Amino acid sequence: MLMKSAHVLVWFRRNLRLHDNAALNAAVASGLPITCVWVSQRPSENHNPRQSLFHYQAAQELHTRLAAHHIPLYVVASDEDLLPLAAALNAHTVITDEAYTEAEIRQDNHLWHNFDQAGIALQHANDRGILAKSPLMDANGLPYTDFAAYKQAWLQAYSGQRPSETKLPVQIGQNVPLFPAHTGAVLPAYQQSGETAALTQWHAFKQNLVHYPITQNFPARKNTSLLNAYLSAGCISPRLLAAESLANRHFEWLDKLIFRDYCY
C-alpha cells in the first residue's frame, strides 16, 4: 500500500455522503490524488449496536460510490491507525469534518500534534452544520444564549452558504480495497441507511412541507421528517435542506434546522 506520489487523505466522520461534502471538495481542489478513510468506531461515541450498524451501512454505500471513481476508502479500527495509514499513503494533508464534542476536540488536538510531528497537515471543513460553529458570536464575542437573537444573526450570515456539487475525478492506478464485513450485531433496521435512502426520505418529506406548520404536531401520523439519523451520520447535507427550505419558503422547517445549528 506504500504510495510514492503525494496524496490527500479524506477522513470521513459524520459526513458520510458525496453530495455537498466540503471535505471532499477541498480534496478535489488540492489537485492531488484522493484516498479516503473511515474509522469504524469513534471514541466519543457510546457503544450503540444499532447506530454502529447504521453508520457501517452508510460507509459501505459510500465505499461503492467512491469505487466508481477509483477512489479507495480504507476502514481502520481506531483514530490511532490514521497516522500509519497517512504515512503509508504519502498523504501531505488529512482533511476531515469539524469536531464538535469535547471528546472529539481533545482527540483532534492529540492527532494534530502527531500529524504535525510527521509533517502532515490536519485540515477541517464544516460538514455537520449549515454554518460553521465559530462565526456566530454575540457583541461580547461569546456564543449566543438566546435563540431569537441567534436566529437573526444566523439569517444575516447565511446568504453565502449554499450546497455545492462534489465533482469527483475518475482516478487512474489506484487499487480499491474490499470493504470489511460487519462484525457487530445485526439488528432489524428501522430505516435503510446511506445517502441514497436519505435523499429519498427528504424528497418524500418535502412534498408535504407546505402542511408542516400544522402536521408537525402529530408525530404519531409520521408527519415528522424522519431525517434525524441521516443528519447525525451526515448522509445528507443540512445546507441542502436549508437551501431548498428557504427557496420554497418553508420557514417553520427552516427554524428547526437553525435550532439544530444553535444546539451545536
Region spans (language model):
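Glycine/tryptophan-enriched, flexible segments
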Residues: 120, 141-264
